[in-house]
């Protein structure tokens, strides 16, 4: 029996979703192969939480825990932290330094994909289309006329490094820009302002499954709100249709684009890429490397449509990281 540390929580606004994802992994872990340990990672504490919710501190020197005088070490870490420090390369670098296998991509890919601006800049030379964008760092002069001239209206103002659609605003007039920029700055000190793409939004899961890169069935997202925001993602304010209602030819095109991004970046583990399809062309918005793993989340939905159970999905991720 291998000891698997399931890390969850984190330092960002996404910690509540991460705790749900981590508990789903814990629930569906194959108990005939693995001993699962829920590890909560917060700024103020790293702790193992047992079945009675008792907490035991993690020794950060080797990521072990001592319970009733017995030192427990782990064979592998299953990373379920959305946002920092689990999705931006910090935990990946730490585990690499101490020689502990973990289920997500390496630290460089994690840091790169967490930064929307840098990710899209790296992928553009490979023919992957993106929205027109304008970048701001906190403290920069805000020239609203210049922004509108470049990206047009409506547009989206986003934190450069944040997930679950926290801090994102759809802006319909130049006068709304300063407020939207302030909202985004609450999540990150870098922001990205993108042109509005009027098309079909889809989400594409790509995983390494049993040694082969596999594109999962594509999900079409129809939001009741202006865009696929936090409410739409987690509070039922959207329709998520898997497989997407797009042609076979377009399904192949979008899948190949997502797969190319995965391969170009030398990814490992899970990835979920978001696209808007305009005039039969997919435009990439972002890539998530620790996508939601709640039972309602897109990757579990897509895996189910592909005939892959949650237990099998999680076993595959662990076995690949141990290989």
UniProtKB/Swiss-Prot annotation:
Binding site for Mg(2+) 2: 286, 288
Annotated keywords: ATP-binding, Cell shape, Cell wall biogenesis/degradation, Cytoplasm, Ligase, Magnesium, Manganese, Metal-binding, Nucleotide-binding, Peptidoglycan synthesis
Protein name: D-alanine--D-alanine ligase
Binding positions (ATP): 148-203
NCBIfam families associated with the record: D_ala_D_alaTIGR, PRK01372.1, PRK01966.1-3
A cellular component term, taken from the record's GO annotations: cytoplasm
Family: Belongs to the D-alanine--D-alanine ligase family.
Binding-site positions, Mg(2+) 1: 274, 286
Domain of life the protein comes from: Bacteria
A biological-process GO annotation: regulation of cell shape
Keyword Signal: no
GO molecular function, one term: metal ion binding
Intracellular or extracellular location(s): Cytoplasm
Gene behind this protein: ddl
Enzymatic reactions: 2 D-alanine + ATP = D-alanyl-D-alanine + ADP + phosphate + H(+)
Enzyme class: ligase
Domain ATP-grasp, residue spans: 120-319
InterPro entries: ATP-grasp, ATP_grasp_subdomain_1, D-Ala_lig_Van_CS, D_ala_D_ala, Dala_Dala_lig_C, Dala_Dala_lig_N, PreATP-grasp_dom_sf
Major location category of this protein: cytoplasm
Pathway: Cell wall biogenesis; peptidoglycan biosynthesis
EC assignment: 6.3.2.4
Task performed by this protein: Cell wall formation.
Note describing how the cofactor binds: Binds 2 magnesium or manganese ions per subunit.
Cofactor(s) it depends on: Mg(2+); Mn(2+)
Source species taxonomy: Bacteria, Pseudomonadati, Bacteroidota, Flavobacteriia, Flavobacteriales
């Amino acid at each position: 029996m291998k000891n698997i540390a399931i890390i969850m929580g984190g330092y960002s606004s996404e910690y509540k979703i991460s705790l749900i994802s981590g508990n789903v992994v814990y629930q569906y872990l194959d108990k005939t192969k693995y001993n699962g340990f829920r590890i909560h990672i917060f700024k103020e504490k790293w702790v193992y939480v047992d079945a009675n919710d008792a907490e035991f501190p993690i020794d950060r020197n080797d990521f072990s825990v001592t319970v009733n005088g017995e030192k427990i070490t782990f064979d592998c870490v299953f990373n379920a932290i959305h946002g920092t420090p689990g999705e931006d390369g910090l935990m990946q670098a730490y585990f690499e330094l101490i020689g502990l296998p973990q289920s997500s991509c390496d630290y460089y890919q994690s840091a790169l994909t967490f930064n929307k601006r840098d990710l899209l800049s790296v992928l553009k030379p490979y023919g992957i289309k993106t929205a027109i964008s304008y970048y701001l760092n906190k403290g920069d002069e805000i020239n609203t006329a210049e922004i509108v001239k470049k990206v047009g209206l409506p547009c989206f103002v986003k934190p450069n490094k944040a997930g679950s659609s926290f801090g994102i605003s759809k802006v319909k007039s130049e006068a709304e820009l300063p407020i939207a920029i302030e909202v985004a700055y609450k999540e990150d000190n870098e922001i990205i302002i993108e042109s509005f793409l009027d098309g079909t939004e889809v989400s594409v899961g790509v995983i390494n499954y049993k040694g082969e890169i596999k594109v999962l069935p594509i999900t079409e997202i129809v939001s009741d709100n202006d865009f696929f925001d936090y409410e739409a993602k987690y509070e039922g304010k959207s329709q998520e249709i898997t497989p997407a209602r797009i042609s076979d030819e377009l399904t192949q095109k979008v899948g190949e684009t997502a797969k190319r991004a995965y391969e170009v970046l030398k990814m490992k583990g899970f990835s979920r890429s978001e696209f808007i399809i305009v005039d039969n062309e997919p435009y990439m918005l972002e890539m998530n490397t620790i996508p939601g793993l709640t039972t309602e989340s897109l990757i579990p939905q897509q895996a189910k449509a592909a005939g892959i159970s949650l237990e099998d999905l999680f076993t595959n991720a662990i076995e690949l990281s141990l290989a």
